[in-house]
Amino acid sequence: MDATAVLHKTDADAHITVEDLTMAYGDFVIQHDLNFTIGRGDIFIIMGGSGCGKSTLLRHMIGLKAPARGNVLFDGISYWDTTPVEQQRIKRSFGTSFQSGAMWSSLTLAENVALPLSEYTDLAPADITEVVSLKLSLVGLSGFEEFYPSEISGGMQKRAALARAIALDPEILFFDEPSAGLDPISSRRLDDLILELRDSLGTTIVVVTHELASIFTIGDNAVFLDAETRTMIASGDPRTLRDESPDPGVRRFLNRGEI
């Protein structure tokens, strides 16, 4: 740890702490006064209706956008108050899978997964090949190393993007709408894979989604962002929120499709 890293007192079990966070573009406030913690090894859901700021919150959490106010802490270290060297160390503990998948179309799956290994490690080419094969195997894509993204299905592309996200053995995985564009069967397979990764590797996972099936299948805890009040109006186990939240908007969101 960098000697100048700024430590804050947080919940002893908290891996990530969002503290008094306000997000804004200029004078326009997107969300304000967000406060929640994410436990180590939890699958945490950021949920809410369209346009409420879910993906924007993710961008603040992974260091792509600075908050108007407040902070994001990792193991008690304040990301936005620490040094650039410490910020890079924290970012190295992340794996991120964006909604588009962001695979390089001109590279094979193996070459895509190898990119972070080539960029951030001193592994020999033979060792990189071995790690790539392992990561693709973990997501059920063993034997597809030489395929290009255009040659596989959307669900397989999502899994390949996940293999790349876990290439550096991250402590924290961030997903932005992982089920977007997938059919229900492919979505369920991806949810099962996310659960397997958490259970086998102990990874803390943060997922932006509005898909109820995913929310209830994988979510340990959640925060609900409200577009009207521009703040969080509920947090906790999504199944408990569905049945017991005092806020009717939260119950409506989590009971969509119920008769």
Q: Can you say where each PLM-predicted feature lies in the sequence?
A:
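Conserved ABC ATPase "signature" region
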Residues: 77, 125-143
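Catalytic Walker B motif of ABC-type/P-loop ATPase nucleotide-binding domains
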Residues: 173-176
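ABC ATPase NBD Q-loop/coupling interface
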Residues: 71-89
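Helix-to-loop junction immediately C-terminal to a conserved catalytic motif
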Residues: 62
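Conserved ABC ATPase signature
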Residues: 148-152, 156
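A short, proline-enriched helix->beta-strand linker immediately N-terminal to the Walker B motif
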Residues: 167-171
